[in-house]
């Protein structure tokens, strides 16, 4: 099991990116959350099996879908905390 925090920049707010991330996470059985940040980036906190989480990171990093254009993803490993679902946070 592994947990990462990701800061995603590019055209990622106002284009359905958080919902896209949630769909991918749920399909891959990844838990955690996603939220918009005031500076126009999106933060993702994700937890899952190491190999699945690596695939998730690659998928997010390579997203070019419709108006969504990911330009950069900063990933930092964190201590596993045991999320049970994946949610969109609005804080």
Curated annotation (Swiss-Prot):
GO terms for molecular function: acylphosphatase activity. This is Acylphosphatase. Residues 3-90 form the Acylphosphatase-like domain. The gene is acyP. Keywords: Hydrolase. Belongs to the acylphosphatase family. InterPro entries: Acylphosphatase, Acylphosphatase-like_dom, Acylphosphatase-like_dom_sf, Acylphosphatase_CS. PANTHER family: ACYLPHOSPHATASE (PTHR47268:SF4). It catalyses: an acyl phosphate + H2O = a carboxylate + phosphate + H(+). It is an enzyme of class 3 (hydrolase). The keyword tRNA-binding does not apply. The active site is at residues 18, 36. Its EC number is 3.6.1.7. It comes from Methanospirillum hungatei JF-1 (strain ATCC 27890 / DSM 864 / NBRC 100397 / JF-1). It holds the Pfam family Acylphosphatase.
